[in-house]
Amino acid sequence: MKDNKKTYLTIHGHFYQPPRENPWLETIEVQDSANPYHDWNARVTAECYTPNSVSKIVTQDNKILDIVNNYSFISFNFGPTLLSWMEHYSPYSYERIIKADVESISKNNGHGNAMAQVYNHIIMPLANKRDKYTQIIWGIKDFQYRFCRKPEGMWLAETACDDATLEALIDCGIKFTVLSPHQAKSVRKLTPDNKEKWSDVSWGNIDPARAYRYFVKSDKTKHIDLFFYDGPISKSVAFDELLTDGNKFISKLKAGVSKDRNYNQLVHIATDGESYGHHTKFGDMALSYILKARAEDEGFILTNYANYLEQEGVQYEVDIKDVSSWSCAHGV
């Protein structure tokens, strides 16, 4: 019997560079380590941000078959300070990023690919309450200025979060965020009476193929939806040179699909966006290859997190570890 279950695919890229401007000059000085470029912003833009906006799909003898704006097909966030720099120093790439979000809205039932980001990339659990709200509000305002819409999701620096951070996101109108699987503590089925038993997932074994709902501990009327990315596949993209071969990349994504799941599953990964071209040369081309040439043929439905939530909803509740991030074994 044919399996009619859907398999969604979301690839998220977190694109960020720290502010490098000399505060006295309000410009970036020459950075010798970025040679042959003027500075590291310029170098990473040339190696990653621009190529992903005009990424090539080629034959084995390097004949160009298509040119793809990868941002039209992936979930992404850009640091506000990075976009501020790009607006002035890489305007054409900047415009293609904004255009990609507009194009994605029509493909995803009114939901754009772009997510907002806390403004200064600070570790939110270490911030006081006022600074938490400031970072979120500034991030939202910057997003609205650039993308001309309200953000539905927000990326947390290093995915660092705690209960107070998630409550602040909720209070500011954010609907979802993305975390590491190792940040989840326990899950249970959502029921009206809340009597389902909790299952321990604290060692990173949460099922990443669905969304989860988190309720604020001090006020159960407040909730936010959380996605926990596929850890092993994300790690391979970031550290195992998976992006040197588009065929290996799509095979790894297919390995994230399980026939044992009796629901419409979401295969999704999240890494630093710089993986696609800066960390791995021509990684943008492996990405465009699987997005435009392979994903649909392999049974994937390309989507973003907001559209997935509208289509599939949330059936499970999650509790998270008290203070955690994707990059620190002892929390933050």
Residue ranges and their predicted role:
Residues 2-59, 69, 80-81, 195-234, ...:
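Active-site and substrate-binding clefts of carbohydrate-active enzymes
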Residues 8-13, 18-129, 134-135, 152-156, ...:
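Short, well-structured secondary-structure segments
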Residues 20-24, 86-89, 126-128, 157-170, ...:
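A short acidic (Asp/Glu
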Residues 60-63, 135, 139-143, 161, ...:
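Alpha-helical packing segments of well-folded alpha/beta enzyme cores
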Residues 95-113, 137, 149, 170-218, ...:
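Acidic, His- and aromatic-enriched active-site or binding-groove loops in soluble protein domains
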Residues 108-123, 146-157, 178-186, 224-233, ...:
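Core alpha/beta catalytic barrel or barrel-like domain that forms the active/cofactor pocket
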Residues 132-156, 217-219, 254-270:
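CE4/NodB-like, metal-dependent polysaccharide N-deacetylase domain
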Residues 134, 138-145, 164-171, 285-289, ...:
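Alpha-helical scaffolding segments of alpha/beta enzyme cores, especially the outer helices
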